[in-house]
Amino acid sequence: YVKQEDMLPLFNRFYGAAKDYTFVILGDCTIQDIKPLITTYIGGLPKGSNDTDWCYTERNIPYKSCSLIRHTGDSPKASVSLIFQQDSLLEEFSSFTLKSNVMKAMLRTCLLNRLREEMGKVYSVSVAASAGLYPSFLSRTMIGFVCLPEDVDSLVNATQEELQRLYEYPESFDGILTDVKRNLLKDFELDKQKNSFWTSWIRNSIFNQQEDWKYLNNYAQTVNSITAK
């Protein structure tokens, strides 16, 4: 483990020098006005090289179903997490990420309807989807809810049934998909007004080596082209 007094020296060892970093700067100004400030800032950063020779190159993930059950006291509630992951990327990463976000929103709507409205056994359902290209591709979808311990099996079975139904009869979810796409486009119109959106987008595009700048220009068209199938 890492001791507290070792954390800052380790950080400086790995990330202290500015060499080979890419800086993303946004501002309502001209390059002529801000260039002296950028030069002064970067020129004042520590020089030298970072110690990054060691790289973690692979992920060891299980390829079969497994369960982890832990009893933590006498609480009358059970916290359930279903995790699905894969390591095969069959399309462009940006397209995969967008479709994952669509799937996440659709799945949450379906599970809320089934587990809360129909079964009445949960207050809410969380669905999260994430993916990364490095050190090797891995995507993960997580479904979570809190329920009575005696309801765990029936809720897990119902969740799996909804996943199977979404896979076998995608056209029956067209109404939900339409709402999801409409909300994505609304969110995009708001997000693109924020500097934080652009800095994160540029940073992630450079880091992932996915510098397709036309993607944002064609975002609405791409979203509208997604079908349930």
Task: Annotate the PLM regions.
Residues Y1-T52, M119, S124-K229:
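Charge-rich, well-structured scaffold segments of protease-associated domains
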Residues N50-C110, R114, G144:
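His/Glu-based metal-binding/catalytic segments typifying zinc-dependent metallopeptidases
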